[in-house]
C-alpha cells in the first residue's frame, strides 16, 4: 500500500455535511485495509479566487495509506460529489503524522488566548511608560 496526502474543498453551504463525508471516506479506505495517519478539518477559509461562485470553502486534509483500488474509489467519490469543489491527491514516500502548519498555527493561537485569559486582571503598562529625565 502507498501513502497519500489528500486535500479537498467542500462548498460552504454543505459544511454541515463534512463529518458525514469524512466518515464515508474513512469507511471506503478502511474497508479495503487502509489506514488514516492524519485527519485535519481546517474549517471555512477564504478562497484566492471564486470557484463555482463560492468565495469560501471548507478545507479538509487527510494523510492515508491505501491500495490503488481504494484510491480510485475515493477519487470517483470526490469527482461525482457536487459538494466537493476541488480535490488534490499527492503520493507521499512515507506516512505524515505531524500536524500541518495550519493546525500548528491554530493550537498556538489557542494557547496564547488561554494564557491571556489566565493572566487577566491589572494590565501591565510598564512597557508603555515613558522615562522622563531632567
Curated annotation (Swiss-Prot):
Region (Disordered): 100-134
Compositional bias per record (Basic and acidic residues), positions renumbered to this chain: 103-115
GO molecular function list: small ribosomal subunit rRNA binding; structural constituent of ribosome
Gene Ontology biological process terms from the UniProt entry: translation
One family name in Pfam for this protein: Ribosomal_S6
GO cellular component: cytosolic small ribosomal subunit
Superkingdom classification of source: Bacteria
Keywords from the UniProt entry: Ribonucleoprotein, Ribosomal protein, RNA-binding, rRNA-binding
Family indicated by similarity: Belongs to the bacterial ribosomal protein bS6 family.
Function, as annotated: Binds together with bS18 to 16S ribosomal RNA.
Name the record gives this protein: Small ribosomal subunit protein bS6
Organism of provenance: Acidithiobacillus ferrooxidans (strain ATCC 23270 / DSM 14882 / CIP 104768 / NCIMB 8455) (Ferrobacillus ferrooxidans (strain ATCC 23270))
Gene of this entry: rpsF
Amino acid at each position: 500500500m502507498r501513502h497519500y496526502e489528500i486535500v479537498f474543498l467542500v462548498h460552504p453551504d454543505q459544511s454541515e455535511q463534512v463529518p458525514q463525508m469524512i466518515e464515508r471516506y474513512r469507511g471506503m479506505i478502511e474497508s479495503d485495509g487502509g489506514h488514516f495517519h492524519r485527519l485535519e478539518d481546517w474549517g471555512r477559509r477564504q478562497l484566492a479566487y471564486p470557484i463555482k461562485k463560492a468565495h469560501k470553502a471548507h478545507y479538509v486534509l487527510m494523510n492515508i495509506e491505501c491500495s490503488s483500488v481504494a484510491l480510485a474509489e475515493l477519487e470517483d467519490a470526490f469527482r461525482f460529489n457536487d459538494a466537493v469543489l476541488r480535490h488534490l491527491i499527492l503520493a507521499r514516500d512515507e506516512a505524515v503524522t505531524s500536524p500541518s502548519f495550519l493546525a500548528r498555527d491554530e493550537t498556538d493561537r489557542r494557547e496564547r488566548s488561554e494564557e491571556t485569559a489566565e493572566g487577566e486582571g491589572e494590565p501591565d503598562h510598564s512597557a508603555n511608560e515613558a522615562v522622563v529625565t531632567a
